[in-house]
Amino acid sequence: LDLQGDTGPYVQYTHARACSVLRKAKTPPTDVIDAGTLQLKAEYELVRMLEEFPDVLASVLNDYKPHILTQYLLKVSHKFNEFYHESPIIGAENADIAAARLLLCDCSRHVLHNGLKLLGLAAPQEM
């Protein structure tokens, strides 16, 4: 089972990692944040990647090319793991930054979960 690189288990592991962060957080993600709170490059790049999800789905449906979704989920996984390593969520500098990062983690989890399910793959909460 290869949890590194461009594999299905890598995407599943990334989903499980996001679930773990959300479980360890003392509060649930908030629905509203100040977008200006996210300042790091890894945060910005992950937000931009997540914004592409509706367009990726439209492309998959219009072109009948499911590999577009698999490539996208791998990119999201790479960006999430960069964010995870560069942007502490639990133990962030202040509560506003922690809340913003926690919401970004939850949004990433949603995209990975939905993408995996669309491909007929499990989205495990633990690995």
Region annotations inferred by a language model:
Residues 1-127:
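Non-catalytic interaction-recognition regions
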